[in-house]
A protein has these predicted regions:
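Non-catalytic, solvent-exposed segments at the cell envelope interface
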Residues: 2-400, 410-414
Length: 414
């Protein structure tokens, strides 16, 4: 079996494992009258006429290898919808577990790349984040420098010293604090690693540099003509750098020792948050690996954490989240708008978490969506559970109508 074949086999096992976990979660939550299989059968019926399509975005994976061919950096680049210039930079932790906790083995994305190369890495990223990539590209430090040259220099605020291993010794490349970085220095920060240290020790500085890149782009640094084909990640970066760019990092969750007996440098992605942001900026690219129904989730401005909790609750029962809208209607109780009336009993059972639920039929359903879940104040105004995720950047959450700020300052919901 080839290395790539092993990745496909692992990815299939991952999806099957997620569905098994979803079925167990359903039973644990007492939802005995609903089965994931019946959800699946309902969700796969023919699309009703006159559905609304989501705007099309281009999603690419940019991987950076250091001089030893170690996976040193990873980010998703997402275009704005349609033919707009600009986009999103979404750094992905390279230590994320590609198995999402299924099986006996924890396999970091760094290990996937080392074994299966960039194609295997792309498959793993798609599985972890439930997103479909249009393209993927691996660049060397020199190639990364050329790619980032149009935005350099950048003004970065480094949370900690940038350290690297030089001649078997740890040295400080850049001290913590404000600093100006040219393109070569940007790549140094993105690839620097002290041998033996955890990947998470690098993350604050990596996220800070991606934020600095987004800020440096301003209203555009490159030339891009609307309608120009985007066939490579290089094309996508050029398009993104031609307009306003937003950076958003993904937090991680420590893996319990009993699930990582080998003590590997592996973390779990905060999947609820990652899916929430991706379903916000690239709904047309979201996949549906779960056997349950596929949702669009809406909430009015100001409820980012509550919306994340709702996404997490849906993922737990094996549902899929394709779209998220932070500018939903203000309602007293939550409302579920069905694409098909026959899904009513399943939706009511699925959504006991959200309290009183008004159920109706969506007269303008979205393509690929079974249910539009509009969260009401009865659910949104409840006290949130104590956070269990760990993040590597300090951020404050607010809401506006259409923009999302960088991950190291204020996070604003689109």
């Amino acid at each position: 079996m080839t290395a790539l074949s092993s990745v496909r086999r692992k990815r299939t096992s991952l999806i099957l494992g997620l569905n098994v976990l979803a079925l167990v979660a359903v039973a644990a939550l007492g939802l005995m009258g609903v089965t994931a299989l019946r959800h699946y059968e309902g969700a796969k019926k023919l699309e009703p006429p006159d559905t609304r399509a989501f705007p099309t975005s281009v999603v690419g994976m940019l991987a950076i290898a250091d001089d030893t061919n170690r996976l040193a950096g990873l980010a998703l680049v997402v275009s704005l919808p349609g033919d707009q210039a600009g986009g999103y930079l979404l750094p992905v932790p390279t230590s994320v577990d590609s198995t999402l906790g299924t099986g006996d083995e924890r396999i970091a994305l760094t290990a996937v790349y080392a074994q299966d190369g960039v194609e295997g890495l792309a498959l793993a990223v798609e599985g972890v984040l439930s997103v479909t990539l249009n393209s993927s590209q691996l660049v060397t430090p020199a190639e990364a420098e050329a790619l980032l040259a149009p935005v350099a220099p950048v003004q970065a605020q480094l949370p900690r010293d940038v350290r690297d291993t030089v001649d078997d010794a740890a040295v400080v490349l850049f001290p913590a604090g404000a600093t100006e970085l040219d393109a070569a220095q940007i790549v140094q920060v993105l690839t620097a690693e002290v041998v033996g240290e955890l990947e998470s020790a690098r993350r604050d500085n990596i996220n800070a540099v991606w934020t600095a890149i987004a800020t440096a782009v301003g209203v555009g640094k490159t030339e891009w003509i609307a309608g120009t084909p985007v066939t490579t990640v290089t094309d996508l970066v050029t398009r993104a750098f031609a307009g306003t760019v937003i950076s958003q990092s993904f937090p991680t969750i420590p893996i319990a020792a009993e699930l990582n007996p080998a003590g590997l440098d592996v973390e779990q992605i905060d999947r609820a948050e990652a899916v929430m942001w991706l379903a916000t900026v690239a709904p047309g690219s979201m996949s549906a690996p779960g056997l349950g129904l596929t949702y669009r989730v809406e909430a009015p401005p100001g409820y980012v954490e509550q919306l994340k909790a709702a996404v997490g609750a849906l993922l737990l029962i094996g549902a899929n989240v394709k779209s998220v809208d932070f500018n939903g209607p203000v309602l007293s109780v939550s409302r579920a708008l069905l694409t098909r009336e026959e899904e009513r009993e399943f939706v009511i059972s699925d959504n006991v978490e959200f309290g009183t639920l008004e159920v109706g039929v969506d007269t303008q359903p979205y393509e690929g969506v079974d249910v539009v879940l509009q969260l009401g104040s009865e659910y949104l105004d409840r006290a949130l559970p104590t956070p269990t995720t760990t993040t590597t950047t300090a951020s404050t959450t607010t809401s506006t109508t259409s923009t999302t700020s960088t991950s190291t300052s204020t996070t604003t919901a689109p």
